[in-house]
């Protein structure tokens, strides 16, 4: 079966069961870790999961693996191994490049969350979040809570639907990419920036407790609580083996930031501690890096199988510059003129912001042609990309008060050392209109259940 047939079959069962959306959620609204970082301790949840068939999952996982491999190769293939040049090309500022060069890994991490939409023909990538600070890894709890409801549990059993324990896989990512195994019992410091620590502490505490259940000895802290002395990094009198970084590139370029970062990054370079994940993820996660993969002039760098994956999963994406670019049909056009004339089919995105910040939808009802042109011209002076619009198919979901509603989803597919390691979905009611799908605009969070991946032939 596939996404569509599984969804149709489950909606038929729900209609016969006659359960309310509240009953379908079970105890999900009371889950501690899932709601610890939500406003008022309560999130908005979809009353049913989304589904993927085995063949769909196999192809999607393969496409993401090819994309990540291609992304990892860009500094070498395009810049001769000059990582600073790569970082500048994808829009990092001078101070950001300097910070990244102080804390790099031997290779790009495989821990990522790909935010995708399905347009009916397949999945298209909107952005790629890379590194230790990605959200959505706690999706395993959403799956477990929903599967406590008998109607979904029975449906999942009959159709062979399952999920991946993303938290367990995250622990595996941390250990493997830091050079440890579980038997080493490394001491982990889950480390935030001081100014954000108090707000994030409830969630960090819950996460460390869950990691502890999986055998990982982790403690929440902020960077100012770490001490570098005697050839080690210390937290509360314990030598730390791994720093799991949740602070961001924007934090480390602020005033007086070097006082906090320099001792720790120097200790990492000396091999006294591992950082999961290093700051180089900020360059790989830039949307301009996706533009480099999309640009016609770089296609010769990749094998045919990789190109097939990129063509399937990556919408037409270009850095906003005064230059000629190639369209999907091979036509050469002036980028600024083309973008200005095709607002309804394009979106502007800052290269390094997340959560929909700074995104301009060319088709927005309240955006005039003059305003769109002004946004395009302004983007020439900042690191921006322009991307082809993707028109997603909507999902039917039971809602409070009875009946169903249509939701516009963004799928968050998580990858790690073992490839696909789970996923979730954020979805916004269609009545909200064409707005960015995020919590600020009323997005609900849902689970992903899937068939076992089909064998690769």
Regions found by a protein language model. Name each.
Residues 1-457:
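Preference for protein termini
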């Amino acid at each position: 079966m596939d996404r569509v047939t599984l969804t149709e079959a489950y909606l038929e069962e729900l209609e016969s069961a006659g359960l309310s959306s509240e009953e379908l959620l079970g105890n999900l609204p009371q889950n501690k870790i899932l709601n610890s970082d939500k406003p008022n301790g309560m999130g908005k949840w979809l009353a049913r999961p989304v589904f993927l068939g085995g063949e769909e999952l196999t192809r999607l996982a393969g496409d993401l693996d090819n994309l990540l491999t291609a992304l990892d190769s860009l500094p070498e293939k395009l810049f001769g191994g000059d990582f600073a040049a790569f970082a500048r090309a994808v829009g990092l500022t001078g101070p950001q490049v300097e910070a990244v060069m102080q804390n790099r890994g031997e290779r790009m991490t495989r821990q990522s969350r790909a935010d995708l939409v399905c347009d009916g023909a397949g999945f298209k990538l909107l952005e790629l979040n890379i590194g230790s600070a990605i959200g959505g890894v706690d999706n395993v709890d959403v799956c477990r809570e929903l599967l406590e409801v008998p109607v979904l549990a029975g449906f999942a059993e009959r159709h062979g639907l399952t999920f991946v324990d993303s938290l367990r896989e995250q622990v595996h990512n941390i250990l493997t990419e830091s050079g440890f195994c579980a038997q080493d019992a490394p001491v982990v410091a889950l480390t935030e920036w001081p100014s954000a620590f108090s707000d994030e502490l409830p969630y960090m505490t819950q996460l460390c407790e869950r990691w502890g259940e999986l055998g990982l000895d982790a403690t929440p802290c902020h960077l100012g609580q770490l001490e570098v002395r005697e050839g080690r990094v210390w937290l509360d009198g314990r030598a730390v083996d791994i720093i799991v970084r949740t602070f961001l590139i924007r934090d480390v370029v602020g005033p007086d930031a070097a006082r906090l970062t320099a001792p720790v990054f120097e200790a990492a370079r000396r091999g006294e501690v591992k950082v999961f994940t290093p700051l180089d993820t900020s360059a790989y996660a830039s949307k301009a890096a996706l533009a480099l993969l999309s640009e016609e002039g770089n296609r010769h760098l990749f094998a045919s199988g990789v190109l097939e994956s990129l063509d399937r999963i990556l919408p037409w994406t270009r850095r906003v510059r005064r230059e000629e670019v190639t369209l999907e049909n091979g036509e050469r056009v002036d980028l600024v003129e083309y973008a200005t004339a095709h607002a309804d089919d394009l979106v502007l995105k800052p290269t390094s912001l997340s959560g929909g910040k700074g995104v301009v939808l060319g088709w927005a009802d309240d955006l005039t042609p003059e305003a769109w042109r002004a946004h395009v011209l302004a983007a020439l002076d900042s690191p921006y990309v322009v991307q082809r619009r993707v028109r997603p198919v909507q999902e039917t979901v039971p809602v409070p008060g009875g009946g169903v509603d249509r939701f516009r989803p963004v799928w968050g597919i998580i990858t790690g050392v073992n490839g696909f390691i789970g996923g979730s979905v954020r979805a916004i009611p269609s009545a909200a209109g064409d707005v960015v799908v995020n919590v600020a605009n009323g997005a609900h969070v849902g689970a992903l259940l899937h068939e076992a991946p089909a064998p690769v032939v």
